[in-house]
Amino acid sequence: MKLNTNEEIIRKANSILRMAGSRSPERICHYLGIHLYETPLKRQKGVYKVIEKRRCIFIKNDLDPVMRNIVLWHEIGHDQLHRKEATQFREFNLFDMTTNRMEYEANLFAAQIGLDEDQLWDYIMQGRDDVSIARVLNSDGNLVALKVSTMSRAEYNLRIPEHRNDFLK
């Protein structure tokens, strides 16, 4: 497995945003030629798989709209970053970044695609915390914390909020 740097992941996500012209995960899937299937998954929220050269995302059919978008961005991240590894179904906790580098990379990709930096910066400057920012941006506090962490490392001087990796368990 090739490890991607944070900079490579952010660059890839930004390139897709520019080319697709949208943050909509459905539009991005369409633009990239990824087939999307809603299915009654039991334990997983989403799965990325290549089947006979057909790139597929299987997503749990009863997710709320916010979680659905996050899961789709995450699975699109696997398509863009880990396509070669998508040869078998694997079960991972979406936000378990401590045990699996691929999951961390897909989460970072999702944070970059899903959260506009300018909007996020405006809310940070208003003094909001990661949970209230997530609520206002229809996202998740863990995704906001991850994005703030990457912004802090890149060019901003921010206090990095703590986040739980296992909140979906």
Sequence positions of predicted segments:
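Active-site hotspot residues in diverse enzymes, especially metal/ion-binding acidic/histidine motifs
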Residues: 1-169
